């Protein structure tokens, strides 16, 4: 069995902590069994490891998130497949399946499980995946989905409606799918025994390759990736699940949450405050996450979520936190992330100014982890000035190599090739 983890998202749902490169699944806000901070994706992969399935993971993600995946999951040695462009879940799954077929040389009868990288769930979830695999092995259906037993007639999820029959059966044929219904219809669907669509699919590799080869039939994974734009921009549900002639569902009744809103996330945070925060005794149902170095004091607040980062500040009534996305549109699309993690380390933007003469100055604080490096590169339109503030490293500037230490200042002019490797953790402004 192979697992494809889908990692996407635009980073808007938990703004200002999340952004285009640091989507919600990468926020280290949860607590591991050892008491350490962990992200949603780290939690899921840890659970997969505990289920004995670690060696089978391939993460399908965008190029902008690849470094974050490598940083957070590097210790697990997962494979990473990057989309050349974002084109929804069907192309992403097709590309990852092509990787399994053409790079990992998996057989057509290899069973593949596709799942999101960020469900907040428990061990029984992975036992249900095992049941899905068993259903595919026994040819109960070509495509098997996980259905989450609903806790309310929610309009936030799609629904899977099983065929009439034995509702207690472990595997049920699917009658139809309903996409995010209004509450009245959702209540009717619950009466019919409908399940939330958990976005988890199981199938044989040959099943999906026959489908994606209708669009891109190429001898190598490299060519499939090069022709990625030929895949339709459509979800896996629409392109495959809803058109499947042989589809079944296995239900899961344990803990399952989508931590995609501030209201949902705060219910699972290990404490009411994270960061430099003072919350007075009169504060009621208030959660504060402060990523800034500045102190934040809350007095007499009620039913609020407050979050601060270098990207902005959010103060929201918890019941209205789901409305965040429509307000973000007012900020425009030209804002850049103020914090990013890369394969070599991380950086934070600490100042950005444009002078009257048009000159722009961007100031960053970089941390390059010991043994990592920024690759040999050249800039055609800007100059850089590096000040080493802590640690030691090896600099290559226009082919000349030298060691650098705290206090060294390096002026990198246009058209000069440069690279730097950290001997110890290296901090640069």
Regions found by a protein language model. Give the residues of each.
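Conserved N-terminal catalytic core of the sugar/cofactor nucleotidyltransferase
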Residues: 2-5, 15-20, 30-116, 120-126, ...
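Short beta-strand segments
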Residues: 5-7, 60, 113-116, 145-149, ...
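Residue-level signal for inorganic ion chemistry
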Residues: 41, 96, 118, 160, ...
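Conserved core of the sugar-phosphate nucleotidyltransferase
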Residues: 122-228, 248
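Left-handed beta-helix
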Residues: 203-387, 392-410, 416-418
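Double-stranded beta-helix
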Residues: 419, 423-429
């Amino acid at each position: 069995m192979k697992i494809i983890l889908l990692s996407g998202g635009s980073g808007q749902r938990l703004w200002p902590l999340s952004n285009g490169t640091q989507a919600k699944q990468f926020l280290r806000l949860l607590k591991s069994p050892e008491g350490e901070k962990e992200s949603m994706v780290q939690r899921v992969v840890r659970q997969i490891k505990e289920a004995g399935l670690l060696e089978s993971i391939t993460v399908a993600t965008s190029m902008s998130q690849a470094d974050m995946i490598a940083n957070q999951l590097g210790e697990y040695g997962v494979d990473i497949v990057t989309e050349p462009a974002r084109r929804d879940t069907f192309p992403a799954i097709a590309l990852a399946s092509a990787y399994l077929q053409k790079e990992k040389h998996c057989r057509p009868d290899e069973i593949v499980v596709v799942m999101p990288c960020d469900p907040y769930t428990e061990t029984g979830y992975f036992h249900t995946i095992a049941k899905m695999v068993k259903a595919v092995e026994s040819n109960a259906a070509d495509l098997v989905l996980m259905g989450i037993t609903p806790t309310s007639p929610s309009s936030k999820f799609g629904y899977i409606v099983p065929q009439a029959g034995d509702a207690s059966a472990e595997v049920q044929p699917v009658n139809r799918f309903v996409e995010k219904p209004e509450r009245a219809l959702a209540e009717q669907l619950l009466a019919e025994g409908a399940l939330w669509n958990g976005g988890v699919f199981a199938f044989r590799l040959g099943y999906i390759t026959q489908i994606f080869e209708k669009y891109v039939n190429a001898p190598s994974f490299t060519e499939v990736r090069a022709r990625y734009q030929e895949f339709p921009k459509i979800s896996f549900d629409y392109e495959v699940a809803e058109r499947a002639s042989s589809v079944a569902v296995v239900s899961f009744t344990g803990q399952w949450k989508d931590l995609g809103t501030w209201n949902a996330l705060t219910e699972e945070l290990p404490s009411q405050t994270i960061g430099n925060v003072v919350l007075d005794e009169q504060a009621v149902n208030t959660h504060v996450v402060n990523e800034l170095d500045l102190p934040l004091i809350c007095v007499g607040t009620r039913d609020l979520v407050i979050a601060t980062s270098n990207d902005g500040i959010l103060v929201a009534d918890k019941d209205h936190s789901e409305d965040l996305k429509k307000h973000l549109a007012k900020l425009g699309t030209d804002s850049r992330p103020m914090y990013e993690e890369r394969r070599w380390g991380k950086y934070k933007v600490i100042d950005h100014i444009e002078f009257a003469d048009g000159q722009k100055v961007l100031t960053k604080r970089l941390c390059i982890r010991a043994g990592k490096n920024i690759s040999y590169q050249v800039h055609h339109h800007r100059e850089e000035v590096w000040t080493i503030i802590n640690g030691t490293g090896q600099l290559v500037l226009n082919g000349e190599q030298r060691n650098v230490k705290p206090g060294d200042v390096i002026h990198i002019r246009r058209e000069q090739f440069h690279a730097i490797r950290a001997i110890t953790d290296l901090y640069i402004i």
